[in-house]
Amino acid sequence: MDPIIEQLRGKVIASCQAYMGEPLRHPETMAQMARACELGGAGGIRCQGLSDIAAIKGRTEVPVIGIWKEGHEGVYITPTLRHARACVMAGADIVAIDATDRPRPDGNTLEDTVRPLKEEGVLVMADCSTIEDIRHAFAIGCDIASTTLSHPGAAIDCGMADGPDVALVRQAVEEFPDKPVICEGRVHTPADAKAAMDAGAWAVVVGTAITHPTSITSWFVEAAGK
C-alpha cells in the first residue's frame, strides 16, 4: 500500500471548498480553513481548484486530495486527463476524478484517463455512484474508491438529517476487503462518521458539516424556528 494512502487509514478528511459567489471563496481563506482542520485532527484535506490546491499544500502537512470542478452537470469533477494533470502540477498528492459511466466531455473513457495517470505514478481516487462504478474503478487501476457521487445533488443542498451511504460502503468493503474504500457525501454528524468507519471505511470525508458555515448556520436556524 502506498504510504500516502496508508496515512489516511482511519482518519477524517476535511473537504475545504467554497462555491462560486460565496464569501469564503479565496485560496488563502481555504488554506486557513484547511490548517484549522489539520489542527483539529484531520488526517487529509480535499480541495477544489488549482489555486486552492497550491495554497493548501503550502500550509498543511497532511495529504491533499485535489479536484478541479468544471461546471455543475454531468461529469464535472476532474473531467479530463488535462484537468487531472493540472491538479498534480498544483501539488495534489492524490487526484480525485468522476468514475461514473457517464459520457466524458473529451470523449475518452475513464480508463483512457486513468491509464496514463497511473503510468505517471499518480495516485487516483475514483468518485463513484454505485457498486458497479467501484468494481470498474478498481479493475482499471484506481487506488481508492469513494462514495462521493452516490447521492443526487450538491452536498450543500442536503439537510442535516440526510446521512451517508453506509450500505454502499459496507458492500464495497465486503467485495474489496484489501482496497481503500472512502465514505464521502452527507457525513453531517460525528455519529455519521462513526457509522461509516464501523462499516469498514478506510477514511471518512467530511465537508459541509465542518467547512461550510452557511449550511451549518441554516441547520440551526431551521431547528430553532420549529
What are these regions (language model features)?
Residues 83, 110-115, 119, 130-131, ...:
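Short loop-to-alpha-helix "cap/lid" segments that border enzyme active sites
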Residues 41, 59-64, 90-94, 119-121, ...:
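Glycine-enriched alpha-helix->loop->beta-strand junction motifs that scaffold or abut catalytic
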Residues 42-49, 76, 93-106, 123-135, ...:
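Catalytic beta/alpha-barrel core
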Residues 19-24, 71-77, 101-106, 132-136, ...:
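Short, small-residue-enriched loops and turns at beta-alpha junctions
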Residues 17-19, 90-104, 144-158, 199-220:
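Glycine-rich phosphate-binding active-site loops on the catalytic face of alpha/beta enzymes
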Residues 1-89, 132, 136-140, 225:
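Conserved N-terminal beta1-alpha1 strand-loop-helix module at the mouth
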Residues 1, 19, 23-24, 165-226:
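Alpha/beta catalytic cores of nucleotide-metabolism and tRNA/nucleoside-modifying enzymes
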